[in-house]
Structure formats: C-alpha cells, structure tokens
UniProtKB/Swiss-Prot annotation:
Sequence positions bearing N-methylphenylalanine: F8
Subcellular localization, as worded in the UniProt entry: Fimbrium; Membrane
Result for mutant: K156Q: In strain: Serogroup H1 isolate VCS1215
Organism: Dichelobacter nodosus
Transmembrane regions listed in the UniProt entry: 8-28
Transmembrane recorded as keyword: yes
The entry's keywords: Disulfide bond, Fimbrium, Membrane, Methylation, Transmembrane, Transmembrane helix
Protein name: Type IV major fimbrial protein FimA
InterPro entries, alphabetized: Bac_GSPG_pilin (IPR000983), N_methyl_site (IPR012902), Pilin (IPR001082), Pilin-like (IPR045584), T4P/T2SS_Core (IPR050470)
Miscellaneous notes: The sequence shown is that of isolate 265.
Gene name tied to this protein: fimA
Length: 156
C-alpha cells in the first residue's frame, strides 16, 4: 500500500514565515508614518476651523471670555494646560493643549497654537502646529513636526 504525504514541508513553512516577517518589517514603519501624517492633518483641519470664530470675534470687538470659540477639544491635543483666554501662554510640552492668542485690534497678530499630547503618535509628542493671522488678515500655518509628516498646506 502506498502512503500519501499531505501538508507542507518544514522548509516551505520557514520560507512563508520569512516572507511574512519581511513584509511586516516594511509595512509597520510605513503604517506608523501614515498614522502620524493623518494626525497632523486632522489637527490642522480641526484648529483651522477656529479661524472663522476668531475672525467673527475680531469683527464684533469681543475680547477674552466674551468671545465664544465653540470648539470641542481634540483627543490628540490632550488639553491639559491649554486655554482659550486672551493672550494665553503655551501649554506644558508633552502634555498637549490648545492656546488661542488674539488681540482686540484686527491689526495685531493672532495665533491658534495646538500642542500634540500623549494620545498622538510618539513622534508628535510636544510638537506644535500654529495658525498665525497677520495684520493684513491672512492666515498661515506653521509647524515643528518632522518634514515627512507636514501636510501640504502647512510646510513652514
């Protein structure tokens, strides 16, 4: 009686495991970069929406606590230490937060500064993304995150 062999040999299984290991070694860092880039873009979008509220406050002449920004904090900013008061100071690095600095005059420089907290990717902890309004009423974005994570609209 002839016996039939079924299944894979040890060599075949080892080759499959090696291929999976190589693919994982390439894919995991790429995925981590993708996550960090998407988080920077998300914070840029979330904080960028506050520009309209700040413009409205400036046009209405409202100051500090009289100006309702109407923003729900982002879990990527981990709002510890952040504030939305007139001339707020920077949050504790690594803790994250949101600081909005604006003056009553529309000719002054106004800022929306977001600091990435502990819920963001490890490479983003303590990094900042800032929207700055010039006296000419134009907004620009700047950030200190690594170049490979910067969104197209925030390359400064």
């Amino acid at each position: 009686m002839k016996s039939l062999q079924k299944g894979f040999t040890l060599i075949e299984l080892m080759i499959v495991v090696a291929i999976i290991g190589i693919l994982a070694a390439i894919a995991i860092p790429q995925y981590q970069n993708y996550i960090a880039r998407s988080q920077v873009s998300r914070v840029m979008s979330e904080t960028g929406q506050m520009r309209t509220a700040i413009e409205t406050c400036l046009l209405d002449g409202k100051e500090g606590k009289d100006c309702f920004i109407g923003w729900t904090t982002s879990n990527l900013l981990a709002a510890a230490g952040g504030s939305t008061t007139n001339n707020a100071t920077a949050a504790d690095p690594g803790q994250g937060g949101l600081n909005i600095t604006y003056a009553l005059e529309s000719t002054a420089e106004n800022k929306i500064e977001a600091t990435f907290g502990q819920n963001a990717a490890a490479t983003l902890h303590g990094k900042k993304l800032t929207w700055t309004r010039s006296p000419e009423a134009t907004w620009s974005c700047s950030t200190d995150v690594d170049e490979k994570f910067k969104p197209t609209g925030c390359k400064k």
